[in-house]
Amino acid sequence: TVVSQVILKADDELRYPSSGELKSITEFLQTGEQRVRIAQ
């Protein structure tokens, strides 16, 4: 998922996620309900 990809990339580079990466996680989490509805 987007969340694990962002965390793993930052971890590999020995840094915290950037503000842009954190924003992409936030957007991913905010659209979760919509993705679940589509999947049903």
From Swiss-Prot:
Transmembrane segments: none annotated. One of its GO terms (biological process) is photosynthesis. It comes from the Bacteria. GO terms for cellular component: phycobilisome; plasma membrane-derived thylakoid membrane. Its main location: membrane. It is a peripheral membrane protein. Belongs to the phycobiliprotein family. Heterodimer of an alpha and a beta chain. Light-harvesting photosynthetic bile pigment-protein from the phycobiliprotein complex. Allophycocyanin has a maximum absorption at approximately 650 nanometers. This is Allophycocyanin alpha-B chain. It comes from Mastigocladus laminosus (Fischerella sp.). The lineage of its organism: Bacteria, Bacillati, Cyanobacteriota, Cyanophyceae, Nostocales.
